[in-house]
């Protein structure tokens, strides 16, 4: 049964608001062995039953000629610098032969000789995730959750959309997918036959990242998941915002992802993604999501978001007002009228909600509604009110956040959740304004070891 059927979900609220309904599945989505790429990443595929977008996603109200991610390189940033590091120590044995004990060994390997750059945060002690069930309220043991040991089966869904031949075209998203795929296989024992890869340079129409294919693949990813399984979702492409209809967003906006056919079939909203990927998971199942897109801070609608100090971030309307004002001013100085008007519109909305009290979302109610006993972790490319950069590193187009994740984990594999967030921000600081975000389906001990 489709997750959320028979209870209030985003689909029922959106029945009159556009094409967000459940796709019509004719058969169960099975992951055939992905074909290897036989063409350059930037070569667009032939038309196979979908229409490439002729204009950019509408969520920012940009004119077609103004929509880029970003419209120009960051000030003071020269292209063709940096790059993905050479792979570090591989796992023992070939990835296809890895057993559960080998995967567990990778989580406890001694990486003391791989400290990473001096600028990185270096955890003094990294504790493994506890095996015991945890309780949301120690005084009330009725609500529990469980960390995953990540020693079971492993599946991955990797999505990269360049939006070829459109004014919304990106250059690094398909490269991101290839880099993440290679990283998961070489470091964490994922197998290519247990991956579904959707990119818009492929000939097989089943592998084009249309809305129906993405939703079908999301169902495949979580189907049959058991405690200690490790699931991985990576999305690199356009993101945006739309009006929040169920009152679970402090800023009044839902995060959205844009499939390649968004013009005809619409975007994918965070409530829908949460219904499919988070709600069905049992305690102890791990889903790690890496969302490299604009406005992606709440792309999975996870209720607990953490700061670089390791504490839960609470909504701050006055801080939002200051942030929107600064973004509008910077856009004015740089001549980016599209960004300026978007920031001013967001500022007006924030001030209005502060004045009327209409933005008073019941944070505790939202946390109870979006809480999951599973172990769902998301690193997103930016805050809900930020854009993410389509960057160039070492002469190769890439998403800035995807690049920082692979680089940090390759140069210093022994990370806590907190140090990983801090070090990813360190990698981007000075070159990009975006700030990667960390969120979770349950209260998270950010000083535990980050495992996959």
UniProtKB/Swiss-Prot annotation:
One of its GO terms (biological process) is apoptotic process. This is Metacaspase-1. It comes from the Eukaryota. One of its GO terms (cellular component) is cytoplasm. The active site is at 238, 294. The gene is MCA1. Residues 16-41 have a biased composition (Low complexity). GO terms for molecular function: calcium-dependent cysteine-type endopeptidase activity; cysteine-type endopeptidase activity. Its EC number is 3.4.22.-. Keywords: Apoptosis, Hydrolase, Protease, Thiol protease, Zymogen. Residues 1-97 are annotated as: Disordered. Involved in cell death (apoptosis). Belongs to the peptidase C14B family. PANTHER family: METACASPASE-1, METACASPASE-4. It is an enzyme of class 3 (hydrolase).
């Amino acid at each position: 049964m489709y997750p959320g059927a028979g209870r209030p979900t985003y689909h029922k609220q959106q029945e009159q608001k556009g094409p967000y309904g459940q796709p019509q599945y004719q058969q169960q989505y099975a992951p055939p062995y992905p074909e290897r790429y036989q063409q350059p990443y930037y070569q667009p595929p032939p038309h196979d039953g979908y229409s490439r977008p002729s204009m950019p996603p509408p969520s920012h109200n940009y004119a077609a000629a103004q929509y880029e991610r970003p419209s120009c390189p960051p000030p003071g940033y020269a292209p063709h610098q940096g790059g993905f590091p050479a792979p570090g120590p591989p796992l023992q044995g070939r990835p296809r032969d890895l057993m559960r004990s080998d995967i567990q060994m990778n989580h406890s390997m001694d990486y003391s000789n791989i400290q990473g750059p001096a600028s990185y945060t270096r955890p003094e002690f990294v504790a493994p995730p506890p095996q015991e069930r945890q309780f949301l309220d120690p005084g009330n043991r009725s609500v529990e959750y469980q960390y995953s040991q990540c020693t079971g089966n492993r599946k991955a869904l990797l999505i990269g959309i360049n939006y070829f031949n459109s004014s919304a075209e990106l250059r690094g998203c398909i490269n991101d997918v290839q880099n993440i795929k290679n990283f998961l296989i070489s470091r964490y024992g994922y197998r290519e036959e247990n991956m579904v890869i959707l990119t818009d340079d492929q000939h097989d129409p089943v592998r084009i990242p249309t809305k129906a294919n993405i939703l079908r693949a999301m169902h495949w990813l979580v189907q049959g998941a058991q405690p200690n399984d490790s699931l991985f979702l990576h999305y690199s492409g356009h993101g945006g915002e739309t009006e929040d209809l169920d009152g679970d967003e402090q800023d009044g906006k839902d995060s959205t992802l844009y499939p390649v056919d968004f013009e005809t079939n619409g975007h994918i909203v965070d409530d829908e993604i949460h219904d499919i990927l988070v709600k069905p998971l049992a305690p102890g199942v791990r889903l790690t999501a890496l969302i490299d897109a604009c406005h992606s801070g709440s792309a999975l609608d996870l209720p607990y978001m953490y700061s670089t100090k390791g504490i839960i971030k609470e909504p701050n309307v006055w801080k939002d007002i200051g942030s929107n004002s600064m973004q509008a001013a910077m856009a004015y100085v740089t001549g980016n009228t599209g960004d300026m008007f978007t920031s001013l519109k967001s500022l007006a909305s924030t001030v209005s909600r502060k004045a009327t009290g209409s933005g008073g979302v019941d944070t505790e109610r939202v946390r109870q509604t979006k809480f999951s006993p599973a172990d769902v972790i998301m690193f997103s490319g930016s805050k809900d009110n930020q854009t993410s950069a389509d960057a160039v590193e070492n002469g190769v187009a890439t998403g800035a956040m995807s690049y920082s994740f692979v680089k940090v984990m390759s140069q210093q594999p022994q990370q806590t959740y907190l140090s990983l967030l801090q070090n990813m921000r360190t990698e981007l600081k000075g070159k990009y304004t975006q700030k990667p975000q960390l969120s979770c389906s349950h209260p998270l001990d950010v000083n535990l070891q980050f495992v996959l």
